Amino acid sequence: MSNSKVRIYELSKELNLDNKDILEICDQLNIAVKSHSSTITESQAERIKAKAEKLNHQMAGKIHSGSGIDRGQNLAKERKQEILAIHHKPNRPFSSTDAPVGSGQSSPLIEPPRPPMKPQPPSPSRSEVTSPITDEPVSTQEDTNGSSSSHEREPQSPMSPFDQQQPEQNTTDHNQEQQNQLKYNQEQSNQLEQESAISSELSEVNVSKLLRPPVRPSEKPASVPSPSKEKEAKSNEPTKAQPIISPKENKSHSKENKLKLPSDIKPKPNKDKDRDGKKPDKEKDKKSLSPQPKVKRESREQREPRESREQREPRESREQREPRESREQREPKLSTELKRPTPPKPPQKPKQAEVAALAIEPEDVEDTAEDLLEEDPLEALTQKPKLKRPTPPKVGKRQNWDEEEEETEEGKGKAGKAAKAGKNKRRQLLLEDEDDFDSDLEEILEIPTAVSISTARPPKPKSMKPAASGNGASKNVKAPTKAEPGRGKSAERERSERKDRKEQPQRAETLVLDKTMTVRELAERLGIAETEIIRILFFKGIAVNITQTLDFDTIQAIAEELEVQIESPEVKAAATKTTEMLDANDLENLHRRPPVVTIMGHVDHGKTTLLDSIRKTKVAQGEAGGITQHIGAYHVDIEHEGKQEQIVFLDTPGHEAFTAMRARGARVTDIAILVVAADDGVQPQTREAISHARAAEVPIVVAINKIDKPESNPDRIKQELSELSLVPEEWGGETIMVPVSALKGENLDTLLEMLLLVAEVGELSANPDRLARGTVIEANLDRTRGPVATLLVQNGTLRVGDTIVAGPVLGKIRAMIDDRGNKVEEASPSFAVEILGLNEVPAAGDEFEVFENEKEARALADQRSQDLRQTRLQQAMSSRRISLSTLSAQAQEGKLKELNLILKADVQGSVEAILGSLKQLPQNEVQIRVLLAAPGEITETDVDLAAASGAVIVGFNTTLASGARQSADQEGIDIREYNIIYKLLDDIQGAMEGLLDPEEVESPLGVAEVRAVFPVGRGAVAGCYVQSGKIIRNRQLRVRRKGEVIYEGVLDSLKRMKEDAREVNAGYECGIGVSKFNDWQEGDSIEVFEMVMKRRTLSTK
C-alpha cells in the first residue's frame, strides 16, 4: 500500500471534505503538496484521514450547527451546495447517539442539511411518540444543535409558527433541552467565534442562496414589511436565518421564544410522526446541523442584502426540495431557539400579525414536505446546484407565487420542463415543491434573518465573502458585454469600409494643380485607387511607386487619361492682408493710433537716406554696400497743427532678392511711400512695390527723390507712373506725388503732412485695453541675448511678462527695446519693439498673440510646431526636382551633382531672401541642398555638420563663434562670409558650375583654299593658300566642297617649300596631305580646328 499513490482530490471525495481542507491538513502534517491534483502516498493518506476525523469531532463539539467532519461529507455529496452539507453533517453524528461520525451515516445526514430551510415540529413530537428515552438524548443534542442553530435561527422569527407548535407538544422536553442548549450555546458562542473562518467558507457557498435578506434593520419588525415579502424572505432564508442568531441572545431569550411559539406548531409534528417515527430524530439532527450553515448564509445575506431575489429564489427552491421532515425537525429546534432571544420580540409583534395571516399556509408546507420526504434526498441535493443557476426564470415564478399561488403551480410545471432540458427530471419535482415552500419559508425567514444577521456575528471579511453566488450570473452577463463591444467594433469597421467603397468610385471632375504631388496624394485628389495611376503610367513606360513624387507634366498626362480637367489655383499676392486684427469686442473701445508707413522702391533710389533725413539719423551709412538688407522699424515724432503726432516707418529692402520682405512690409502697413529716383525712372522693383501696395489695398504716396541732381526729370517719372495707373493729382488723378531731396531735406515737411492727411482719412484706430496682437517684422538669433524678434503691435498693448505665441514659437517677454535702444515696459498699438524671451527664433511675417493662460498658449504652440514639421517634411520630399527613383540611377552614372550648403545669416528675413534666390538658380544638372538655414552665428556644430556631409558654410552678415574657425581649419571646411547678397549668389552659382564636368569645344585655327593638286605616288597633295589664322600639323581638319563637308580627319603632313613645317601662318602657301583622303579638287576649302576643354555654365534646359 505504501507504494500506491493517492490524489488529493480523490481523498477529499472519500472524506467528503473540500480540497482546501485537505491541503490545510497537509500543511499541518508537513506533507508537501502543491495543489488538489498532487499525489501522496497511502501512508500519508492514512495520516490525513486520522487528522480529519479528529478535526471533525472538534468541530462538531464547537459548532452543533454542523461545521465539523460531517460538513465535509455533506459537501462532497452536495458539491454544488457546499454550505448545507458541510455544516449539517458534523452536528448529526455528534448529536445523534445512534450513528457515529463514520462515513456510514454521512449519506442519511446529507438529506437533513438540505431541509434546514424549513424546520418542522414533527421532530420533537416524534421523539415523544417513539420513545422518550431515545428522544431525550436526541433532543438534548438537537437542543444543543438547535440552540446553536437557534441562536442563528432566532432572528428568523418568521419560522415561529412551526416553532410554536413544537413547544406545546414538547414542553417538558423543551425545558431540559433549553438547559442543555444554554450550555451548548455558551460553548458554541466561543467556538463559533473561533470557527468563523469555517462558517465563512460555507457561507460563501450559500451566498448564492442567501442573496437577499429582506432588510438589514436590527429589529425584526422592520424586516417584515408585507406578508408577500415575508413569504419570499422565508422561502429564501430558512436555511440562512437559523445560524445567524448569536448564542448569547438565544440564551437570554430562549424561554420567551419557547413560550410564544408552541401554540401553532402542534399539527405539523403529528403528521411527521405518523409518517416516519425515526426520521424525525435524524431530521432533528440534520436540522441542527443545517441551521449552522444557515447562520453562515444569513451572515452573507446581511452582507449582501441587495442581491436579486432571482438568485435567492433558486437557492431557496433547492432548499425547499429537500425533505420536509428535516425542515419540520428544524422548526421545533427553532422554536426553542426563538424563545431565547428577547430582542427579536418587538419586531415579532408585527410578525405575529404576519404569522396569523400566514398560518393557513403551513398545511401546504406539510404536504410538500411529505412529498419531498418520499423523494430521494441525494437526488434533491444534486438537483439543487442546477436549480441555483437559472435565476431569471425563477424570479418571474416568485412574483406569480406571491400574487397567485395557483398560477404558480402551472408555471412550475413549465419550469420543470425547462429544467428537464438541463438533463435531470428531478429538477421538475423540486420546482413543483418550491410553490408550497415559498409561502411558509417566506413567513418564517424574513423577519428573523434581518435580526439574526445584525446580532449573530460580525460581517465576514471581504476576502472571505463568497463571490460564487454572483459568479454564474455575472459571468453570463460579462461575456455578452465583452462580446458586444467587439461586435460593435466589427460592425463599425464594416460600415466605414462600406462608406469608403462608396466614396472611392466617385472620381473628381476637376483637379486643382497647385504643387507637385505623390502618387498617393494624386489618387486621393482624384478619388481613385493608387494602382490605377501606377497602371496608367506603366502603360506609358514610366515605372513609379506609391510614394514617388510626380511632376506637373506627368500629373497633366494622368488627368488627360482620366478625362479630368485641370485648374490652376488663384495665386494670392504675398502682400494680401489675411487677418483682421480688430474684432467685434474692440469696436466699443477704439482709439486713434499712429499710422504705419512703409517705404518701398527700387534699390539705390534713396529710401533709407530719405528715412534718415526724416529721423535726422544716419542709418544708410551702416548698411553694407549702401543697400538695406532687412526691415527697419522707426518712430518719428512730428508737430502737426500744434499737436505732437507720431508716425512709424518701416524701411524695406529694394534688392530683388527681398521680395518677401517688401510683401511683408506692405501687408502690415497703413500707407506706402513709393520712392522713385528722378534720374533713374521706374525700375522692376518699383513695379513690384506697386503691386504689393495694391494687393494690400493701402494708399500710395509717391516721393520723387533726387530732384537736386541736374539730370533729374520729375515729369518723366510722372509720365511713367501714369502708365502704371498712378496718375498725379495735378494731372487729375488721385495719387499724391511729392518731389523731395533726401540729401538736402527739401519738401520733407510737405511729405509728412501728406502722410498725416491720408492717415486722417483712413481713420486708423485700435483698442489699447486688450491683449496685444500683431506681426513679427524681423527675427534673429543674438549670441548674447538669444532669440530676438521685432514685433509690430497692431492691436492691444504689449507688456513685459506677457505670454506670447508667435507662429509655432512660445515665449514670455523678458524685456522690450525700442528703435533707439531704450528699454520700455509696454508698447501701444502701431509701435515696433524688439522683445527678448522667446524659446526659438520665429519666422518673419508670423502673427503673434498674447495669452492669459500659459497652458493654452503652450498647447497652441505645440500644435503649430507639429503642423510646421509636417509641412517641412512634405516640402523636403517634393523639393527635389529629380524624383527619388531616378536619383540613385543618375548618381551611379555620375550625372547627378549636388551642392550641399549650410546657410547662416543675421536675421530671419535674410535667410528667407537667400533661400528664395537660390531656388531661382537653374538646377537641372546640379541641385542645391540646404542642410541648415537659420539666423545666428556660425558655430562648431555647423562645422561638424559640414564635415560629415561635405557641405560649404555660407555666412551672411554674421560672425563666427569662438572655436568655429579653428575647427573649420582642422576639418578643411570652406567658410564663405558675405555682406552683399548678389555677391553671395554669384559665388554659389560659380560653385555649382564648378561641379559640372567640363565639355569639349571646337576651337577654329585657320582656313586654307586648295589652289592646285599634285599627285604623289598613289596619293595626292593639295597645294593650298592660307587665307586666315594658321594651319597646324596633327590637328583636325574639315574639307568643304561647295558648302558641304566631304571629309573630316587629321592633318597628317604639312610642308612649306618642300620641307616639313609644324605650322603655316596666313598669307603663305603650303602643301597639305591626308593619308585617307586624296580626292582633292581646286576650290575646296580646308578648315583646321582643335578640341578644347571648356568650363560649362548652368543651363536652364
UniProtKB/Swiss-Prot annotation:
The keyword GTP-binding applies. Residues 741-743 are annotated as: G5. Residues 81-437, 452-509 are annotated as: Disordered. GO terms for molecular function: GTP binding; GTPase activity; translation initiation factor activity. Residues 385-397, 414-428 have a biased composition (Basic residues). Residues 185-196 have a biased composition (Low complexity). Residues 651-654 are annotated as: G3. Residues 705-708 are annotated as: G4. It is found in: Cytoplasm. Residues 93-108, 128-149, 157-184, 197-206 have a biased composition (Polar residues). SUPFAM superfamilies: Initiation factor IF2/eIF5b, domain 3, P-loop containing nucleoside triphosphate hydrolases, Translation proteins. Residues 361-378 have a biased composition (Acidic residues). It comes from the Bacteria. Residues 601-608 are annotated as: G1. Residues 592-765 form the tr-type G domain. CDD domains: IF2_eIF5B, IF2_mtIF2_II, mtIF2_IVc. Its main location: cytoplasm. Residues 110-124 have a biased composition (Pro residues). One of its GO terms (cellular component) is cytosol. Belongs to the TRAFAC class translation factor GTPase superfamily. Classic translation factor GTPase family. IF-2 subfamily. One of the essential components for the initiation of protein synthesis. Protects formylmethionyl-tRNA from spontaneous hydrolysis and promotes its binding to the 30S ribosomal subunits. Also involved in the hydrolysis of GTP during the formation of the 70S ribosomal complex. This is Translation initiation factor IF-2. It comes from Gloeothece citriformis (strain PCC 7424). The lineage of its organism: Bacteria, Bacillati, Cyanobacteriota, Cyanophyceae, Oscillatoriophycideae. The gene is infB.
